[in-house]
């Protein structure tokens, strides 16, 4: 028991290595790979620099008015009033935010200018302060959340979304998706992802022709409480997404179906999508995605009966019909992730860019990174052996230093952090600073002659550890701004350099001290 108590730091190091091994290789820790992708031998995820993929860096479309006075109107009323004054806008393109200190109105429709929003607010009767290009920080944060959710729902392993800020104060959204074509990623994140249900119904005749009206947004994304997975239809072509509706909107939807006459005995047959069908069809439910009708469908007799009887709202569920499985999958993703509050400006006019790294180039970067790491380890090993010439000092130093990197790899696998070139640079920095600290320990312990007594060893080790602790604190303080600020690749470098320093001070340096004590002292 005394041996275990005296060497608990070494045991702690071994436990950390075992946990890292579990995180790296356990099937229970790995993310589900999309169908058709090869499974990796480890649970490590790689960024697009090492796996190939697409990077998108773009600002958000929109302008913002500060210090708006709403004159007691609700947010919904303000959105409708302002949207009515901007050509081509609807309430979904206007974001109203109220705060204790300031209230803002954002217009996120394309090609809108600060002058357009200012004129719209004036016409609607709302006093306001400065009107500027760009959106609020809250909108940027919500956009990051929705985009990350979209990427996760689409099964794009290793995809990341973050805000980045330039030195001049410009704000961008940075999207990185490894191992995916540029067109696929742009299609996923380029649209706002709005999904709504409209009712298209006949209202009478005019000169022998039917007349129609559209009741828009009878159901929107916020009205759905459960979204199933996209499924192929068993009765014919097409696909569908099973959904459930919240109680309050379900009652309103049922009333709208009754009022528009869509719930006919025996159901309705919709020919909206056929040539000339818009002028002859019976009532239809329109599935509208990003402002475009992607499908139209009638109502089955059974569903129509429950609507007419007022029973459907008690168990409000139905199927969103689509023409194919890919449409159904897109709709399911948009419903789960939510709509983007503002679109990414991918036009390139405001520095919006997208780039693609081929998988073969990513594999080349992986190989080069591996070679660089091996060269760094061999260089450190050579210097250590030349300096000491004692295997009992040098070998534990190298093994302990490498275990630090292994623990960091396990941590990256556990949290699913995608490795890129900046993180690899952080690992190499950890090897250098880690072995440097171990050399300080060895020099302090052995610099005043041989050490046989455990008491003398502990005294010298404590002096060395104070130096190491001060150096670690300095590194953490220096790197913290890079880790906190959204500075792209520098953030990954800083995070793993700081983690390496922390692991070194808490785990590997104390363990190396215990190993040296066991090998050098006689009263162990």
Curated annotation (Swiss-Prot):
Annotated Gene Ontology cellular component terms: plasma membrane
Residues spanning the membrane: 10-30, 366-386, 389-409, 420-442, 465-485, 487-507
Deleted gene: phenotype: A double secD and secF deletion grows very poorly on solid medium at 45 degrees Celsius, confers a severe cold-sensitive growth phenotype (30 degrees Celsius), as well as having defects in Sec-dependent protein translocation. Has no effects on Sec-independent Tat substrate protein export.
Keyword terms: Cell membrane, Membrane, Protein transport, Translocation, Transmembrane, Transmembrane helix, Transport
Protein topology in the membrane: Multi-pass membrane protein
Gene3D superfamilies on file: 3.30.70.3220, Multidrug efflux transporter AcrB transmembrane domain
Biological process annotations from GO: intracellular protein transmembrane transport; protein targeting
Location, primary (coarse class): membrane
Localization of this protein: Cell membrane
UniProt subunit comment: Part of the protein translocation apparatus. Forms a homodimer and complexes with SecF.
Function: Involved in protein export.
Similarity comment: Belongs to the SecD/SecF family. SecD subfamily.
Record's protein name: Protein-export membrane protein SecD
Organism, scientific name: Haloferax volcanii (strain ATCC 29605 / DSM 3757 / JCM 8879 / NBRC 14742 / NCIMB 2012 / VKM B-1768 / DS2)
Organism placement in taxonomy: Archaea, Methanobacteriati, Methanobacteriota, Stenosarchaea group, Halobacteria
């Amino acid at each position: 028991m005394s041996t275990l108590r005296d060497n608990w730091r070494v045991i702690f190091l071994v436990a950390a290595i075992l946990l890292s091994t579990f995180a790296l290789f356990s099937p229970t820790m790995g993310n589900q790979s999309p169908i058709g992708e090869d499974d990796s031998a480890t649970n490590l995820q790689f960024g697009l620099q090492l796996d190939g993929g697409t990077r998108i860096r773009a600002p958000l479309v929109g302008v913002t008015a500060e210090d708006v006075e709403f004159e007691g109107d609700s947010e919904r009323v303000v959105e409708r009033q302002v949207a009515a004054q901007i050509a081509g806008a609807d309430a979904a393109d206007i974001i109203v935010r109220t705060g204790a200190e300031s209230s803002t109105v954002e217009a996120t429709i394309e090609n809108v200018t600060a002058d357009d929003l200012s004129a719209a607010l004036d016409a609607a009767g709302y006093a306001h302060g400065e009107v500027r290009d760009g959106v609020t920080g809250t909108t940027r944060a919500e956009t990051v959340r929705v985009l990350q959710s979209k990427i996760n729902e689409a099964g794009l392993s290793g995809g990341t979304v973050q805000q980045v800020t330039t030195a001049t104060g410009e704000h961008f959204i940075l999207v990185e998706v490894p191992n995916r074509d540029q067109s696929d990623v742009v299609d996923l994140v380029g649209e706002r992802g709005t999904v709504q249900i409209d009712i298209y119904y006949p209202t009478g005749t005019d000169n022998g022709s039917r007349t129609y009206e559209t009741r828009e947004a009878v159901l929107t994304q916020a009205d759905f409480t459960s979204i199933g997975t996209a499924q192929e239809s068993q009765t014919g072509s097409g696909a569908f997404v099973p959904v459930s509706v919240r109680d309050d909107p379900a009652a309103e939807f049922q009333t709208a179906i009754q009022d528009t006459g869509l719930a006919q005995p025996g159901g309705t047959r919709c020919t909206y999508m056929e040539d000339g069908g818009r002028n002859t069809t019976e009532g239809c439910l329109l599935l509208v995605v990003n402002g475009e009708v992607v499908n139209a469908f009638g109502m089955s007799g059974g569903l129509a009966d429950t609507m007419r009887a007022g029973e459907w709202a008690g168990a409000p569920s139905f199927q969103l019909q689509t023409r194919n499985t890919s449409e159904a999958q897109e709709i399911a993703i948009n419903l789960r992730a939510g709509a983007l509050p503002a679109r990414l400006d991918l036009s390139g006019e405001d520095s919006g860019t997208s780039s693609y790294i081929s998988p073969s180039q990513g594999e080349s970067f992986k190989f080069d990174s591996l070679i660089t790491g091996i060269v760094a380890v061999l260089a450190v090993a050579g210097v250590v052996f030349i300096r000491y010439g004692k295997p009992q000092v040098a070998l534990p130093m190298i093994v302990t230093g490498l275990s630090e990197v292994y623990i960091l790899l396990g941590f990256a696998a556990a949290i699913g952090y995608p490795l890129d070139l900046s993180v690899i640079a952080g690992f190499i920095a950890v090897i250098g600073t880690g072995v440097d600290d171990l050399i300080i320990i060895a020099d302090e312990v052995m610099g005043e002659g041989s050490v046989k007594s455990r008491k003398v060893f502990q005294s010298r080790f404590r002096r060395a550890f104070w130096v190491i602790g001060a150096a670690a604190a300095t590194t953490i303080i220096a790197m913290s701004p890079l880790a906190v600020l959204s500075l792209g690749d520098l953030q990954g470098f800083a995070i793993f350099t700081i983690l390496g320093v922390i692991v070194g001070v808490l785990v590997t340096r104390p363990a190396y001290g215990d190993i040296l004590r066991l090998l050098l002292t006689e009263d162990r």
